[in-house]
Swiss-Prot record:
Keyword Nucleus (UniProt): no
A Gene Ontology biological process term: polysaccharide biosynthetic process
NCBIfam families attached to this UniProt entry: NDP-sugDHase (TIGR03026)
Pfam family, any one: UDPG_MGDP_dh
This protein's encoding gene: ytcA
Keywords: Cell wall biogenesis/degradation, NAD, Oxidoreductase, Signal
Pathway in which the depicted protein is active: Nucleotide-sugar biosynthesis; UDP-alpha-D-glucuronate biosynthesis; UDP-alpha-D-glucuronate from UDP-alpha-D-glucose: step 1/1
Biological classification of the source: Bacteria, Bacillati, Bacillota, Bacilli, Bacillales
Positions annotated as active site in the UniProt record: 259
Signal peptide residue numbers: 1-23
Superkingdom to which the source organism belongs: Bacteria
Binding site for substrate: 148-152, 203, 207, 248-252, 256, 319
Name assigned to this protein: Putative UDP-glucose 6-dehydrogenase YtcA
EC number(s) recorded for this UniProt protein: 1.1.1.22
Binding site for NAD(+): 2-19, 30, 35, 118, 152, 262, 326
Length: 428
């Protein structure tokens, strides 16, 4: 099937590579001429394991900056553009509106328009209304909501091995679900067919629940600290309950990234628009917003002042196996340490400091260069190389003894056997 994907970002490129790998004739289009030029040369604009190789292998995947002509060529169009948060927390659909404008001029034959972008409930119905208002016959298209549930660092695998595929359609649409199923026919997945708003809300509910698990375990970690108990034991025990599950029960500095913070804010805004109170949603965000402060207090308890202290931070990205620093708790940590007068040094295998921090934080290409002569070390992102770290070497070159485990993943006994002090959250 000939398919157009609008948006050459994280979701759009992963989708394009995945569908090309199962035999579809793919065009990935984006108005960013420079990005498309780089993609044609095989240069991927971000780090995602396996994606670059997958794209280079696909002879049936092309790139174009001609959005309208690309859409005209294809009977199926996926929309995968960003919906970043506005200052009030609502989703900014500016890029989506631009695509709708192009669509209104590109639809000359029947199109199945499939939205991958995370959008507030009611958005896809509004897209249909806007296209009809612009003069497009309602017989020439159908709108489908098909949200993505990708994990950065595992995106290509998740696209090809999904735990579910959600298909949202209009009530009178009796053909689009079958078309979407045929697109994914070579992928083993359960299908959930629902309304457009149902599909939009499933995406938000999915991320809300995962974020809630993280905030739940972080609040439990605070209680564990008060009673000198180990949150790791609690996580392991309750995770064995099949009603709860073991995933997303790792206490630490909190969630970040491009999805959870944005989607929780957008869901809260959508609820407010319908005068619906959101007690749990607010609590989840509040716990996450205040979690980093607990670590700052923990660091301060070891020093009379942080002014002039050298801080080594391992990790810049919001999670391992990605270079994404959007809403990264590691970045927030470094901002706070710099404000408190620390001389901050950082290392990450893939991510680069945001521009606003480069005058205040020194980034190194080697971890031990960041650690040398540091007064304390903070593990902010659990990259695999940090889990197999040479702590004896770290102890030899550090000035101070303090290691803060911001992800509760380090082996405390091993580190303290090297003469260091290791502390996390919710652990005695």
């Amino acid at each position: 099937m000939k398919i157009c994907v609008v948006g050459a970002g994280y979701v759009g490129l992963t989708l394009s590579a995945a569908l090309a790998s199962i035999g579809h004739d793919m065009i990935c289009t984006d108005k960013d001429v420079k990005k498309i030029g780089q993609l044609k040369k095989g240069v991927i604009p971000f780090y995602e394991p396996g994606l670059s190789d997958a794209i280079l292998r696909c002879g049936n995947l092309s790139f174009s900056s001609e959005v309208k002509s690309s859409m005209e060529e294809c009977p199926v169009i996926f929309i995968a553009v960003g919906t970043p948060p506005r200052s009030d927390g609502s989703a900014d659909t500016k890029a989506l509106q631009s695509v709708i404008g192009d669509l209104s001029e590109a639809i000359r034959s029947y199109k199945t328009i499939i939205t991958k972008s995370t959008v507030p409930p009611g958005t896809n119905e509004n897209i249909a209304k806007q296209l009809i208002a612009s003069g497009v016959s309602k017989n020439l298209f159908n709108i489908v909501s098909n949200p993505e549930f990708l994990r950065e660092g595992n995106a290509l695998y998740d696209m090809l091995h999904p735990d579910k595929t959600v298909i949202g359609v209009q009530e009178e649409d009796h053909v689009s679900a079958a078309i979407v199923k045929s697109i994914y026919k070579h992928i083993d997945t359960p299908f959930i067919v629902t309304s457009l708003a149902g599909a939009e809300l499933i995406k938000y509910a999915n991320n809300f629940f995962l974020a809630a698990k993280i905030s739940f375990i972080n609040e439990m970690a605070r209680i564990c600290e008060a009673y000198q108990s180990d949150i790791s034991d609690i996580s392991r025990a309750i995770g064995l309950d099949p009603r709860i599950g073991k995933h997303f029960l790792q206490a630490g500095i909190g969630y970040g990234g491009s999805c959870f913070p944005k989607d929780l804010q957008a869901l809260q805004f959508a609820a407010q628009e319908k005068n619906t109170e959101t007690f749990l949603l607010r609590a989840v965000q509040h716990i996450n917003d205040t979690q980093l402060g607990l670590y700052i207090k923990k660091i301060q308890s070891f020093f009379e002042t942080l002014q002039g202290k050298k801080a080594a931070v391992l990790g810049i990205s919001f999670k391992p196996n990605t270079d994404d620093i959007r809403n990264s708790q590691a970045v927030r940590l470094m901002e706070r340490l710099a404000e408190l007068g620390c001389d901050v040094h950082a290392y990450d295998p893939e991510a680069v400091l945001p521009e606003h921090l480069r005058q205040h934080v020194t980034q190194h290409s080697q971890a031990f260069d960041a650690i040398e002569e540091s007064d304390f070390l903070f593990l902010a992102t659990e990259w695999s190389e940090f889990l197999a770290f040479d702590w004896k070497k770290a102890a030899d070159i550090m000035k101070g003894r303090l290691v803060i485990d911001g992800r509760n993943v380090l082996k405390k006994e091993l580190i303290e056997a090297c003469g260091l002090i290791c502390t996390g959250v919710g652990r005695p």
